[in-house]
């Protein structure tokens, strides 16, 4: 089967005009708290895709691969942050450790980082592409899958840079009622971090949406599908939304994936209209 590692040389900058067969690399992103993990779990049940278990983030965060390619961050600093932050770090707001340490062995991390630093000066794009696949593609290979899903929220916001680096990639932008996103984000922060109020949450959501719009314009609308979580979990567009997601990803009918969708993806699990719990009833009509 063809893998990302089979094409790890410096990529062509040709523009993808739209889906053609199953995607080998699918980025699922959004504002955060918009349903990216729900969509990734559905597609992970297919025969084709394996999802990265959590957000890898080294290709989307400040100081990550886009900043390295743009010259805003040096390769040595990137390598340091990869080893000491993205690999494993403690997040106070969630009171837990996060990072790629859960599925990337330390030996693989060191080998990939060493190769990246050795190659970057002569072939910066190829080095950035290679370290992504060196770290993450083994997940697909171990699962005998031909496609990989990465679900860092900012993948669509960074689609301009990622689209050049990975010309084979497609982007799913998961959208959700901004009021529910804001309420979920405030609840996630537990008042320990910004945003702490619904208004701050809405401002946060708006800023993220504007960044995503820039990313979509940069990569081209033909490589991005906007997918409504609200339509996916309920209503008369549920099946249509599922089908558009499946077809954009290049998948045919898949009994395992469809069975999971029918059993597990329901409005009761999506916390629709959660924002009403955070906003006094007298203000809900504003």
Indicate where each model-derived feature is located.
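The conserved 3'-phosphoadenosine-5'-phosphosulfate
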Residues: 183-186, 192, 217-286
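A glycine- and Lys/Arg-enriched "phosphate-lid" helix/loop adjacent to the NTP-binding pocket
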Residues: 172, 181-206
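Hydrophobic anchor at the beta1->P-loop junction of P-loop NTPases
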Residues: 28
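A conserved segment at the C-terminal end of the G1
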Residues: 37-49
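A structural motif corresponding to the C-terminal end of an alpha-helix
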Residues: 138-142, 211-225
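Extreme N-terminal, non-catalytic leader segments
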Residues: 2-25
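Conserved phosphate-donor/acceptor-positioning beta-strand/loop module used by diverse small-molecule
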Residues: 151-154, 161-186
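PAPS-dependent sulfation machinery
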Residues: 53-148
